[in-house]
Amino acid sequence: MKSQTQAPLVVEGKLSDSERMKKESNFLRGTISDDLQNGLTGGFEGDNFLLIRFHGMYQQDDRDIRAERAQQLLEPRHAMMLRCRLPGGVITPKQWLSIDKFASENTLYGSIRITNRQTFQFHGILKGHVKPAHQMLASTGLDALATANDVNRNVLCTSNPEQSSLHQEAYEWAKKLSEHLLPRTHAYAEIWLDKEKVATTDEEPILGETYLPRKFKTSVVIPPYNDVDLHANDMNFIAIAENGHLVGFNVLVGGGLAMTHGDKKTFPRLASEFGYIPIDKTLAVAEAIVTTQRDWGNRTERKNAKTKYTLERVGIETFKQEVERRSGVMFDMIRPYQFTHRGDQIGWLKGVDNKWYLTLFIESGRLIDKPNAPLKTGVAEIAKVHLGDFRLTANQNLIVAGVPEAQKEQIEAIARQYGLINDEVTPLRKHAMACVSFPTCPLAMAEAERFLPAFTDTLDNIMAKYGVSDEHIVVRVTGCPNGCGRAMLAEVGLVGKAPDRYNLHLGGNRMGTRIPRMYRENISSQEIIEILDTLIGQWAISRELNEGFGDFLIRTDVIKPVVNSAIDFYEVQEVI
């Protein structure tokens, strides 16, 4: 990456309006409590529209019926999406049954969506049910604080069931990081849980009174598994173990995938290696990284406010040295690590604890009762008898964790009865991913989750035609360039531009360590299928042993690799 060391550490200029909103919010309170009493609208108004994001919610509406309601002179059917804070994705069966009941009784869609940030979210919570939603979470020991907006979001942790002892240590650090970096304001408890206003003044010693310049994402990674897609995150801790126990972390900073169509000052970026730290320095280093980004991040232009742009502007070494100064910790040389897997291992695995772990493939993470496949009910039935816990994965799947040998047959029987196990699911489908997009996401430009099943059906047929059905290609679809579907770490990435129009990116790799380059701009799904039919056919015939699709495209000069995205991401690819 570039190392420009002469740039100003703080960007001068008029602050974005989001900065005004945060400063005037009285530590994230705004007038949310008053808005809750306003029955004239189903939404939150003014600054509250954005402030509720700090409380884990986005205001949405059903875009399928937006035009119809406008014709009837009705406001959009506002409803909230609420996202739980669930570091490491671990949740108990008792907690699961509570959220299952709430989804059935108090949401418009009756579904639970497992996200690729290892948590779950509800879609379609009407305003009158918002406060009960937060109270339900609190009653089970959960909350939605800081799962959106300019804070450290839900902390990811590798969900590797085979390394159960190491996973437990890494998971504990994911929880510690989440708690350490949480907002300290009492606003959440006052507004949603009816806690009395504390007389003392709120302080935010880490995040500051205007919080971070932009969203901030953190992961804890256990090699050789990159299931959390570390390069999508601002701050990453790669576990280094000795004799089966954590001794420290390699620290990587500045990953991120979001961009803006037509704005070449925005681009996806891989995280940069800072160095190795011993385990007891983790929180000090994490805090120093966050506060450096807090102070140096661009608060004048939100499109360039993320950590990745701060590193590009001030230089990697300058940022790293500031982290060392603030933390009092000097980075050591990076310890050796490698990645060999990214997708989840669907099916049963036995852990070192001699318990069993069943990873269930959940397409796009959507748990809903479908005809002939009541998936949501099935998970609830498992929760009623399961003695271990559940783990939500960063690939939007669900692990039934810690199953005793004596219960294994019972758990599998329930899963099969409710359609949660399907032996016909192909490797390509297991590795595919899509964001939510239409009808609920206000930023969606093209279909993603609703588009993915038919798209993967077609690709499966192409794979079968060329005799490569046992192989997989990492295919991801995101409905807009914000990148929630992590298409910028796929071998085949589709980025929505308009209804049935996508930018096609090719040339990422299976491990998620290379950004794909745009191959064609603004083309239809049919055009994409025709292109992939040809290229998959070539790959099937001419690939080398164990050569992935993305690697093949680069070796054969179909696409040029992105080497330094800050410089070469927008280089024009010649049509071949």
Curated annotation (Swiss-Prot):
Record's protein name: Sulfite reductase [NADPH] hemoprotein beta-component
A Pfam entry, by short name: NIR_SIR
Role summary: Component of the sulfite reductase complex that catalyzes the 6-electron reduction of sulfite to sulfide. This is one of several activities required for the biosynthesis of L-cysteine from sulfate.
Record's cofactor remark: Binds 1 siroheme per subunit. Binds 1 [4Fe-4S] cluster per subunit.
Residues that coordinate or bind [4Fe-4S] cluster: 435, 441, 480, 484
Keyword Cell inner membrane applies: no
Keywords attached to this entry: 4Fe-4S, Amino-acid biosynthesis, Cysteine biosynthesis, Heme, Iron, Iron-sulfur, Metal-binding, NADP, Oxidoreductase
Gene Ontology molecular function, alphabetical: 4 iron, 4 sulfur cluster binding; heme binding; metal ion binding; NADP binding; sulfite reductase (ferredoxin) activity; sulfite reductase (NADPH) activity
Family indicated by similarity: Belongs to the nitrite and sulfite reductase 4Fe-4S domain family.
Pathway this chain belongs to: Sulfur metabolism; hydrogen sulfide biosynthesis; hydrogen sulfide from sulfite (NADPH route): step 1/1
GO biological process: cysteine biosynthetic process; hydrogen sulfide biosynthetic process; sulfate assimilation
Gene: cysI
UniProt cross-references to InterPro entries, sorted A to Z: CysI (IPR011786), NiRdtase/SiRdtase_haem-b_fer (IPR005117), Nit/Sulf_reduc_fer-like_dom_sf (IPR036136), NO2/SO3_Rdtase_4Fe4S_dom (IPR006067), NO2/SO3_Rdtase_4Fe4S_prot (IPR045169), NO2/SO3_Rdtase_4Fe4S_sf (IPR045854), NO2/SO3_Rdtase_FeS/sirohaem_BS (IPR006066)
Protein species of origin: Proteus mirabilis (strain HI4320)
Subunit structure: Alpha(8)-beta(8). The alpha component is a flavoprotein, the beta component is a hemoprotein.
